[in-house]
Amino acid sequence: MTVDELIDSWEGAWSGKDPDAFAPLCAADLHYEDPLTAEPLEGVDELVGHAERLWAAFPDVRLERTGERLANRRYVAAPCKLLGTHKESLEGLPATNRFVVLHCVFYCELQRGRLLRVRGFFDLYDAAVQLGVLPSRGSLGEKALLVLRGFGLRAARGQ
């Protein structure tokens, strides 16, 4: 299997909501993390559990390739976007029924043609804005939030 075929299959496993599709792609001692995992996940079973929570919250979720993948024999960086509607609660966040588009990059380490380590990167703040949980960047709401968090107080006093 080529690197492109491997990553296409990885994206297909997420989009197809097929828990059995991950095992042939991943090393037995897979290490996975993304902004929604509190701790790194170890093994395919933990990855599948994470995927099933996301599939339940975003039943129409899919990953789409967004650009060229950068790869050598050991590493690959795969840009994509995640699209889906938040229909059920996720980690205590009630369903918002909002559609999100998150640009992501999966940075992967390969071992014998399988995924050994995978780190997913996306902007969690942007996700929260799209879900209506946090104010948009540059808005009055964001400025108020920053003041409440203690940012900008010195500048306000000095003016």
How should these model regions be labeled?
Residues 1-159:
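C-terminal and inter-domain tail/linker signature
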